């Protein structure tokens, strides 16, 4: 029987280096970006929290991987492979528990989903306080707080999966996978043709402006 692992990355962010403003690939490729922690919790009792370079990625091979918002964590993993940040492995599946709980009628966020499912309040103040802080500049107390926060997120991700996975239809799973794959692949664009047509459009716009009889005159 294959093992299921919940996985969660913790990354540097600030007002400029932010996925909210840059999108996934813009964020991951930002010069200030740093994926300094990964937490992994398995349904076999396995736990890891630390730098991604210290994690044994091979244990994910032929296993199911879960992330709460896999469009972030899986996409970061795939991007990191292209940058040689960590090893390439082949999980059996990578499921998004955020998509799962939404399909099951729960709020999408981990905080609100666990509040409704388990009447459990979890604080996101640690994540808020991580803004603008690099791992190497955090004091030891805050480092431990971040580690505990990361592990808790993975534990709750796994718990939601164990309780709601049977209620998640195959149809909704397929939609989740296809949407995420489409985002990761992006849109195919012929950039040379785009630039050529943009220049042609600018030239045509200039010609049209020159044909306006009162063009270039000051308004009365």
What is the role of each PLM region?
Residues 75, 112, 180:
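Surface-exposed charge patches
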Residues 47, 82-90, 101-103, 119-125, ...:
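Short, polar/flexible loop-turn hinges at active-site or ligand-entry regions and domain interfaces
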Residues 92-120, 126-136, 146:
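Short alpha-helix plus adjacent loop in nuclease-associated cores
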Residues 73, 110, 153-156:
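Catalytic-loop motifs flanking and including active-site residues across diverse enzymes
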Residues 1-17, 22-23, 30-39, 115-118, ...:
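Conserved "right-hand" nucleotidyltransferase catalytic core of DNA-directed polymerases
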Residues 1-108:
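Conserved RNase H-like, two-metal-ion catalytic cores of nucleic-acid enzymes
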